[in-house]
């Protein structure tokens, strides 16, 4: 049923005249395999930390501020961000390896040297990838909702993740959260605000995406008139 709904939504989008803001991003190249929509991050195969890459080989200008996108999906959002903000470095972390491989292939096609995608379970690997103060900005957008209560422990924003980000983010750095599921968005915010190092300067949700570049799920929601719940938090 979910697949039928997604196909219907995609068909509706393709009939529209609006053009998604991924100009220059290859949209048709397939994975060559069937991809699981959801991956259980608690499975044994995802419990080993991913070692950090040789950062000097990843980024041409290593000293630029680093934006971490957690759950980067297909990577189109981050590829476009890298085009728009060449004075930033971008890292997308994704647990579905085929998406990571394709996103890095797209990056190479586009000739970008300020963006990289990494296959990792972020809740296991985060503290192994960075040193305190390495991160300047974090986005977590439309994470898997894991609706069943017994599956909530699979959700990406857990207390351990928040504590690690508090250590790794520079003071004053933003954390941008969004979801089309109100309960998921509010839970993410609550988890961050339970930690004394994070606060909400807006005292509630915000209306717009401050980056002006939507993810694919966000674009779908906008075209279909579905609500999106957005929050901009900051590291104290």
Swiss-Prot record:
S-adenosyl-L-methionine binds at residues 69, 94, 121, 144. The keyword Oxidoreductase does not apply. GO terms for cellular component: tRNA methyltransferase complex. It holds the Pfam family Methyltransf_4. It is an enzyme of class 2 (transferase). Substrate binds at residues 148, 180. Residues 1-23 are annotated as: Disordered. Gene3D superfamilies: Vaccinia Virus protein VP39. Its EC number is 2.1.1.33. Keywords: Methyltransferase, S-adenosyl-L-methionine, Transferase, tRNA processing. It catalyses: guanosine(46) in tRNA + S-adenosyl-L-methionine = N(7)-methylguanosine(46) in tRNA + S-adenosyl-L-homocysteine. The active site is at residue 144. Pathway: tRNA modification; N(7)-methylguanine-tRNA biosynthesis. GO terms for molecular function: tRNA (guanine(46)-N7)-methyltransferase activity. The keyword Methyltransferase applies. NCBIfam families: tRNA (guanosine(46)-N7)-methyltransferase TrmB (TIGR00091). Belongs to the class I-like SAM-binding methyltransferase superfamily. TrmB family. Catalyzes the formation of N(7)-methylguanine at position 46 (m7G46) in tRNA. This is tRNA (guanine-N(7)-)-methyltransferase.
């Amino acid at each position: 049923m979910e697949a039928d709904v997604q196909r219907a939504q995609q068909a509706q989008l393709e009939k529209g005249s609006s053009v998604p803001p991924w100009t220059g991003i290859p949209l048709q190249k397939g994975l060559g395999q069937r991809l699981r929509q959801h991956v259980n991050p608690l499975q044994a195969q995802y419990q080993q930390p991913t070692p950090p890459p040789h950062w000097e080989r990843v980024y041409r200008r290593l000293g630029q501020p680093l934006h971490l996108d957690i759950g980067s999906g297909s990577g189109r959002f981050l590829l476009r961000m890298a085009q728009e903000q060449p004075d930033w470095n971008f890292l997308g972390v994704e647990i579905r390896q085929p998406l990571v491989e394709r996103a890095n292939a797209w990056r190479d096609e586009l000739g970008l040297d300020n963006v990289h995608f990494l296959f990792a379970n972020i809740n296991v690997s985060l503290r192994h990838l960075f040193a305190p103060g390495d991160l300047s900005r974090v986005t977590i957008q439309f994470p898997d909702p894991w609706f069943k209560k017994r599956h909530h422990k699979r959700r990406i924003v857990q207390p351990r993740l928040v504590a690690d980000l508090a250590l790794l983010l520079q003071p004053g750095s933003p954390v941008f959260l969004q979801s089309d599921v109100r309960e998921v968005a509010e839970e993410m915010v609550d988890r961050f605000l339970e930690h004394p190092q994070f606060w909400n300067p807006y005292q509630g949700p915000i209306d717009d995406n401050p980056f002006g570049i939507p993810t694919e799920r966000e674009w779908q929601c906008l075209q279909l008139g579905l609500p999106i719940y957005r929050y901009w938090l900051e590291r104290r």
